[in-house]
C-alpha cells in the first residue's frame, strides 16, 4: 500500500481557517488551534444572530409604530387591530418607515384604523 502525504490537504485546511480568521486579534489570527476555535465561535454567533436580527428588527419596528401612534392618541395594539378590521394590509416594516419619514401619511393611516374617513 502506498503512503499518502497530507501536506496539500493540510495546507488547504489551514489556509481556509486562516482566511476565515483574517482580521482577528493576536493569536486568534496566527495560531491554528486558537484560530479554529475563534472561527467556530464566530460562525456559531453568526448563525444564531441571523435569527436574532429578525426579532430585534421586529421589536424596533413595533417600538417606532407604538411611539408614533401614541402621539396620535392610539395605542399600538388598537392601531394594529383597527388596521386589520379596515382591511389595510401594511406590514410593520413599512408602517414603521412611514411613521418615521412621513408623519402626515401615518396620521391618515391612524384615521383609517380609528374608523374615520380620510379627507
UniProtKB/Swiss-Prot annotation:
Molecular functions per Gene Ontology: rRNA binding; structural constituent of ribosome
Cited InterPro entries: Ribosomal_bL20, RIBOSOMAL_L20_CS, Ribosomal_protein_bL20_C
One example of a Gene Ontology biological process annotation: ribosomal large subunit assembly
Domain of life: Bacteria
Gene3D superfamilies recorded: 6.10.160.10, Ribosomal protein L20 (1.10.1900.20)
Annotated GO CC locations: ribonucleoprotein complex; ribosome
CDD domains: Ribosomal_L20
Keywords, sorted A to Z: Ribonucleoprotein, Ribosomal protein, RNA-binding, rRNA-binding
Membership in a protein family: Belongs to the bacterial ribosomal protein bL20 family.
Function (record text): Binds directly to 23S ribosomal RNA and is necessary for the in vitro assembly process of the 50S ribosomal subunit. It is not involved in the protein synthesizing functions of that subunit.
Entry protein name: Large ribosomal subunit protein bL20
Organism: Syntrophus aciditrophicus (strain SB)
Amino acid at each position: 500500500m502506498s503512503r499518502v502525504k497530507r501536506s496539500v490537504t493540510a495546507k488547504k485546511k489551514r489556509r481556509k481557517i486562516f482566511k476565515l480568521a483574517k482580521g482577528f486579534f493576536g493569536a486568534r489570527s496566527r495560531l491554528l488551534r486558537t484560530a479554529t476555535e475563534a472561527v467556530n465561535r464566530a460562525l456559531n454567533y453568526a448563525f444564531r444572530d441571523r435569527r436574532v436580527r429578525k426579532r430585534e428588527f421586529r421589536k424596533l419596528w413595533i417600538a417606532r409604530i407604538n411611539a408614533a401612534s401614541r402621539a396620535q392618541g392610539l395605542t399600538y395594539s388598537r392601531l394594529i387591530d383597527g388596521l386589520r378590521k379596515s382591511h389595510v394590509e401594511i406590514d410593520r416594516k413599512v408602517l414603521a418607515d412611514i411613521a418615521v419619514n412621513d408623519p402626515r401619511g401615518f396620521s391618515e393611516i391612524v384615521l383609517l384604523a380609528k374608523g374615520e374617513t380620510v379627507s
